[in-house]
Design a protein with these regions (language model features):
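C-terminal catalytic core of tyrosine-transesterase DNA break-rejoin enzymes
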Residues: 117
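Short acidic-aromatic low-complexity motifs
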Residues: 14-19
């Protein structure tokens, strides 16, 4: 008997400070805070933020440790209605863009930002059919 997923996938990402990352996603990127829990120390233990249909949960890393410096092994890839408009909105807010607007070979127009823990957040709008690099083929 096969099972199907009946809802959205929501990644749970461990961070050093849930408060810091929540503020970045809400204040800088325009997500909405939908739920969280404050621990005995007055800091968020976890929170869930949404942007459109996308949901991301952040939880405090074990022992409150920060992920190691640099790029993290998980990236977040979020579709937006108009990537150019979204990009311009973030730039006007002073958000640092880590990778500029680019049309990728797979047909998405993308840009990236880094969150305070080094997680790459891609924003994209599909604009073309995939055109694999020379010598590669889609399967």
């Amino acid at each position: 008997m096969s099972q199907t997923v009946s809802g959205r996938v929501m990644p749970i990402i461990a961070v050093g400070s849930v408060d810091e990352v929540r503020n970045f996603y809400v204040d800088a990127l325009g997500f909405q805070h939908v739920m969280g829990m404050v621990g005995k120390d007055g800091q968020l233990d976890f929170c869930t933020v949404v942007l459109g249909e996308a949901r991301v949960m952040f939880s405090r890393a074990p022992g409150g440790s920060r992920p190691s410096a640099g790029k993290q092994p998980v990236e977040i890839y979020l579709e937006v209605d108009d990537v150019d408009t979204f990009h311009n909105r973030l730039k006007k807010k002073g958000v640092a863009i880590s990778d500029p607007l680019t049309v990728q070979w797979w047909g998405d127009r993308t840009f990236k930002v880094l969150d305070p823990n080094g997680y790459e957040i891609w924003f994209y709008t599909n604009v073309a059919e995939p055109k694999p690099p020379t010598g590669a083929k889609l399967v």
